[in-house]
């Protein structure tokens, strides 16, 4: 039996940008309105089913507070993916993505997939960072980019599918057209629900 490929994904970004909420939405399809800061590092894993293989995603949720920054390089060091999150309603959190990206580059060079994520699109009326600014930052650093809403569930599964398609050893041709393009195709309706329902393909069992 072929062994299950495992990939480490580390979530980085300032405090309260929604790193934990993105992971919780992906893992359990829930959103906790009560904010609790991550203390140190949390770890969860989930199995993801692609068309031609199954992978185990190991999700490392890091604290955004400055007092925990000394811990983070050691977790970046052996990661396959770095997901750098900012809050679209907080310009400072966007500006600070530069230092998070540089931390990743310093530890991993170019041997890592980096995804820049603008979270909290459900608060579009309070937006301080435009989509164009996010796209420009991603282009500048030659990394991937998307926007999400952990609260509304917008683009969460699409985010992980996009990351999965870029993992080392994954043939991007095995991802369907919809899996490749769903990030730009889905949208938020007036009711705050995704206009396009994303497909499943994830193990929801606690044993995954």
Curated annotation (Swiss-Prot):
SUPFAM superfamilies per record: P-loop containing nucleoside triphosphate hydrolases
GO BP: intra-Golgi vesicle-mediated transport; intracellular protein transport; retrograde transport, endosome to Golgi; retrograde vesicle-mediated transport, Golgi to endoplasmic reticulum
InterPro entries attached to this UniProt entry: P-loop_NTPase, Rab, Small_GTP-bd, Small_GTPase
UniProt-listed PROSITE patterns: RAB
Any one Gene Ontology molecular-function term assigned to this protein's record: GTP binding
Residues engaged in binding GTP: 14-21, 38, 62-66, 120-123
Pfam family, one: Ras
Keywords linked to the UniProt accession: GTP-binding, Lipoprotein, Nucleotide-binding, Prenylation, Protein transport, Transport
GO CC term (a single one): cytosol
Lipid-conjugated positions (S-geranylgeranyl cysteine): 208
UniProt-listed NCBIfam families: small_GTP
Function: Protein transport. Probably involved in vesicular traffic.
Similarity section: Belongs to the small GTPase superfamily. Rab family.
Record protein name field: Ras-related protein Rab-6
């Amino acid at each position: 039996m072929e062994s299950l490929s495992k990939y480490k994904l580390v979530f980085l970004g300032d405090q309260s940008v929604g790193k934990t909420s993105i992971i919780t939405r992906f893992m359990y399809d829930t959103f906790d309105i009560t904010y609790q800061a991550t203390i140190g590092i949390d770890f969860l894993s989930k199995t993801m089913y692609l068309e031609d293989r199954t992978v185990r995603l190991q999700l490392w949720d890091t604290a955004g507070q400055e007092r925990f920054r000394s811990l983070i390089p050691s977790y970046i060091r052996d990661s396959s993916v770095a997901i750098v999150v900012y809050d679209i309603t907080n310009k400072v959190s966007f500006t600070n993505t530069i230092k998070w990206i540089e931390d990743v580059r310093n530890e991993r060079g170019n041997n890592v997939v980096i995804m820049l994520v603008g979270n909290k699109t459900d608060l579009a009326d309070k937006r301080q960072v435009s989509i164009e600014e996010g796209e420009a930052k991603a282009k500048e650093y030659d990394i991937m980019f998307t926007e999400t809403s952990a609260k509304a569930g917008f683009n969460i599964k699409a985010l992980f599918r996009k990351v999965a398609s870029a993992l080392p050893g994954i043939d991007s041709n095995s991802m369907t057209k919809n899996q490749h393009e769903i990030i730009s195709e889905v949208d938020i309706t007036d009711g705050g629900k995704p206009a396009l329902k994303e497909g499943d393909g994830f193990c929801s069992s606690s044993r995954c």
